[in-house]
């Protein structure tokens, strides 16, 4: 079948492939046509970076699909990931790698599924779709890996305007953490947020489990007047 590869310069390359071809094979074909070494190629499809050992059919890439080709910065960089057991893992990454990519690399090395990984840097939990450069993570930075309780849970936050926000949380998350997640989604600073559950205002240092907030519970968000009490 034919697929297309679009470069950052806007050029489109046509390739003859089989669904059973690996991403490595595709990179070799691109090298044959364009002279770009495979180790400098990153291929993206449906927003996801494609891994060398996988096949086109693994990613549901069908005839006339378009892949995007991004060139790697020469050589990338090393970062460290420290686990709760004190073990330190070294990873080869690019600043343009997403947190998803980093979790996949940790899975390759340690066998921990990405959905059980939480990565922390500078006290902040890192979100999957963001890149290392978004968080200003540079060479030889150290991330901390915390394992999620199985799968976490969803809760809802209802604002006074009637809008409902869905959040991914753990029962062990503090009210501060929840307010940070609301800030990430809605841009409201935590110090302007008051969260109410079961008629009770929630205190920052307490956890969701302290208040018996379970999956699919609904919290109410009230905005503090600036300078109020």
From Swiss-Prot:
Cross-link Glycyl lysine isopeptide (Gly-Lys) (interchain with K-? in acceptor proteins) residue location(s): 76
MF GO annotations: protein tag activity; ubiquitin protein ligase binding
One GO location term (cellular component): plasma membrane
Key words of the record: Cytoplasm, Isopeptide bond, Nucleus, Ubl conjugation
Domain Ubiquitin-like: 1-76, 77-152, 153-228
UniProt cross-link Glycyl lysine isopeptide (Lys-Gly) (interchain with G-Cter in ubiquitin), position: 6, 11, 27, 29, 33, 48, 63
GO BP annotations listed: cell morphogenesis; cellular response to heat; cellular response to stress; filamentous growth; filamentous growth of a population of unicellular organisms; modification-dependent protein catabolic process; phenotypic switching; protein ubiquitination
Its biological purpose: Ubiquitin exists either covalently attached to another protein, or free (unanchored). When covalently bound, it is conjugated to target proteins via an isopeptide bond either as a monomer (monoubiquitin), a polymer linked via different Lys residues of the ubiquitin (polyubiquitin chains) or a linear polymer linked via the initiator Met of the ubiquitin (linear polyubiquitin chains).
Similarity comment text for this entry: Belongs to the ubiquitin family.
Name this protein carries in UniProt: Polyubiquitin
Organism: Candida albicans (strain SC5314 / ATCC MYA-2876) (Yeast)
Gene: UBI4
């Amino acid at each position: 079948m034919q697929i297309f590869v679009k470069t950052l310069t806007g050029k489109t390359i046509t390739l003859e492939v089989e669904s059973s071809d690996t991403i490595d094979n595709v990179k070799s074909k691109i090298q044959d046509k364009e002279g770009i070494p495979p180790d400098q190629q990153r291929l993206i499809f449906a927003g996801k970076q494609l891994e060398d050992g996988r096949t086109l059919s693994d990613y549901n890439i069908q005839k006339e699909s378009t892949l995007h080709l991004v060139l790697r910065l020469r050589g990338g960089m090393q970062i460290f990931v420290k686990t709760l057991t004190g073990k330190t893992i070294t990873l080869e990454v690019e600043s343009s790698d997403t947190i998803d990519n980093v979790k996949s690399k940790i899975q390759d090395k340690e066998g921990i599924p990405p959905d059980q990984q939480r990565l922390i840097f500078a006290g902040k939990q890192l979100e999957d779709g963001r890149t290392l450069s978004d968080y200003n993570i540079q060479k030889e930075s150290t991330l901390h890996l915390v394992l999620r309780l199985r799968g976490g849970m969803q809760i809802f936050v209802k604002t006074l305007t009637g809008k409902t926000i869905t959040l991914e949380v753990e029962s062990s998350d503090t009210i501060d953490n929840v307010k940070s997640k609301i800030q990430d989604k809605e841009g409201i600073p935590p110090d302007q947020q008051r969260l109410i559950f079961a008629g009770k205002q929630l205190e920052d240092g307490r956890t969701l489990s302290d208040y018996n907030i379970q999956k699919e519970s609904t919290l109410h968000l009230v905005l503090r007047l600036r300078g109020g009490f």
